[in-house]
Amino acid sequence: MPGMPPFDFKANYLKFLNHEETPLIPNEFVGNSILGFGAVNGPSIEKGGADGSPDGFGVSWVCPETGAGAAIPKPGEFLLEDICDWREKVTIPDPASFDWEAEAARELANVDRSQSVICFGFGNGVFERLAALMGFEEALLAIAEEPEEVNALFEAITDYKIKALDYIQKAYQPDVVTYYDDVATERDLFVSPQTFRELIKPHHKRFAQACIERGIIPFYHCCGKAEALVEDMIDCGWNSWTSVQATNDLESLIPKYGKTINFIGGWDSTGRPGTPYATHDEIVAEVKRVMDTYGKFGYGFSFFGFRYPENGDPAVMAQFMGEIVGEAMNYSIGLMMQKLGAAQ
């Protein structure tokens, strides 16, 4: 932007990670490189191969045209009907069997660490993995009827994910690892807060603490209305809650908790701004709403917005993301320049 002095976007993002005030509202795609699962479907050990081969657990994944490129378990082919059979039916992968070094070399080829934080996305937390193995309905029934068996499976999954951390750290040397485990819908949690705290949270906490022990900053990704769990997220040790949707009361959460846990998101991803039909003016208006409403505190918030193409076309997705990120950067830089001018 004309008149803008040299600016270190990575340093700005690091301030955000340290829960400090930032001169510029952070943007998840500027000064931060998202690798692994998140930008794409990530290592095949978690989401299967592009050729349709199953993941390390034996689950086959497909990318429906209406899913914006996101992989889902192949419909009608769940591996597990009875949670009590998980030891016989489910393969817990050995992270040593996957070529993390080759995956990292490919993903890091065009990344400049001097300019960017490295954030590795590690998909399929314990609840999502249970749903991938059984389907959501059977997974929820298993949680209600056989919590001891579910807990035993969650222990095994978490053991694997913590072992994988060492391979990820060696190959990627990430600053951040994001743990993906959607436990909510747009309206509410899939399970009661008590059930979450008894059955799911201990495994989240164990993984987050394993990251911290290795010097890695742990992020927690959860779509949906999960604001009731913010204090649990803090207790687990998550640095940030990412992909926070507008259904949560971010305007209240940031000043209350933003010096302890960061909030990343704010975009109305389930409203018109998240659709392929949004106009440029609607995108600009949503950028301003998010920045003005959540960025005004100067801490505890990073912008993250996206919209879905109709058929998952990567070129269209890149165009959509370029528009959103570009408008967000122009607006946030303008806000920063206004503050600098007012301070002089």
What are these regions (language model features)?
Residues G38-G42, E65-G69, P73-K74, A131-A132, ...:
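Short aromatic-enriched loop/helix-cap "lid" or pocket-rim segments at secondary-structure transitions
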Residues G3-P6, K47-D51, G76, N151:
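Alpha-helical interaction segments
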Residues M1-N32, T91-Q344:
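Active-site loop segments of alpha/beta catalytic cores
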Residues D51-E101, V111-V117:
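A contiguous, low-structure linker/loop signature
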Residues N18-E20, L24-P64:
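N-terminal accessory/capping or targeting/presequence segment of soluble
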